């Protein structure tokens, strides 16, 4: 199916991670010119660029640092699409009464501030009809006990930030769009080793499909939302990629 993404200039932040690399591969498969962002995963980004070949480039930046984000967009040049995938899930399970302010701030920086700076940089350089895709989480919809910091950041992305951006972007370009995906439990390097089989069985009770997503499941929806052909009249929307999740298991019995 034609997506209209051939030749489009695409930036994928967090491109060396699980969902990010899947997005980069999916855009490259559609003939897009992909720039893969990384922070600490240079080796993975270089390997991915070599795998994709063609016009694929890489760029390193700490997305919580304003100057580095500005440099990233200066290096990227004109862009048509930005997939703001980069984020961080803190592995340690902490209720709010044990949550240090330092972790709270670090989690909001890595997720919400990084997404804000990425969105701002993309909109500043936008010319013509572009597409911005934010990546939230089901934690931002139904919460996540033990990770209130992460849930708060993702909720802000999927709520106030998304809905504000979709109305602001059209001031730059009348047909430009902003949408978001909300992955549920997804197999990725960020979660691998931190989630037990028992935890997966427990949370899958809330899912119609009762399985963990793969990064390519999320990437497929990112491509659909980026496509001016498939989603040209879609903006301000959140697509849940969570196997029909309806909430959280609050009590074991």
Residue ranges and their predicted role:
Residues 16-17:
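Conserved glycine-rich cofactor-binding loop
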Residues 92-96, 100-105, 203:
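Substrate-binding pocket helix/loop in short-chain dehydrogenase/reductase
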Residues 119, 153-154:
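Active-site helix of classical SDR
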Residues 137:
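Residue(s) in the substrate-gating loop at a strand-loop-helix junction
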Residues 172, 177, 233-235:
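Short, small/polar-rich loop/turn modules that mediate ligand/substrate recognition or access, typified
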Residues 207-218:
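A conserved structural motif in NAD(P)-dependent oxidoreductases
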Residues 229-230, 235-253:
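Short C-terminal tail/terminal secondary-structure segment
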């Amino acid at each position: 199916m034609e997506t209209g993404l051939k030749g489009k200039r695409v930036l994928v932040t967090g491109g060396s991670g699980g969902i990010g690399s899947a997005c980069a591969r999916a855009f490259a498969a559609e003939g897009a010119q992909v720039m893969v962002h990384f922070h600490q995963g240079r080796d993975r980004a270089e390997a991915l660029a070599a795998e994709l070949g063609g016009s694929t480039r890489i760029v390193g930046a700490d997305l919580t640092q304003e100057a580095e984000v500005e440099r990233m967009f200066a290096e990227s040049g004109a862009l048509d699409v930005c997939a703001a995938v980069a984020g961080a899930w803190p592995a340690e399970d902490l209720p709010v009464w044990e949550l240090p302010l330092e972790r709270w701030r670090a989690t909001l920086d890595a997720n919400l501030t990084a997404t804000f700076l990425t969105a701002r940089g993309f909109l500043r350089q936008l010319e013509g009809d572009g597409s911005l895709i934010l990546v939230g989480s089901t934690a931002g919809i139904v919460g996540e006990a033990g990770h209130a910091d992460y849930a708060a950041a993702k909720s802000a992305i999927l709520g106030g930030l998304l809905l504000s951006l979709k109305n602001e972007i059209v001031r730059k370009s009348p047909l430009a769009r902003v949408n978001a995906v909300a992955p549920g439990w997804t197999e990725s390097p960020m979660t691998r080793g931190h989630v037990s089989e028992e935890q997966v069985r427990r949370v899958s009770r809330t899912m119609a499909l009762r399985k963990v997503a793969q990064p390519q499941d999320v990437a497929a929806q990112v491509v659909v939302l980026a496509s001016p052909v498939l989603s040209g009249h879609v903006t301000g929307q959140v697509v849940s990629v969570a196997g029909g999740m309806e909430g959280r298991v609050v009590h074991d019995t």
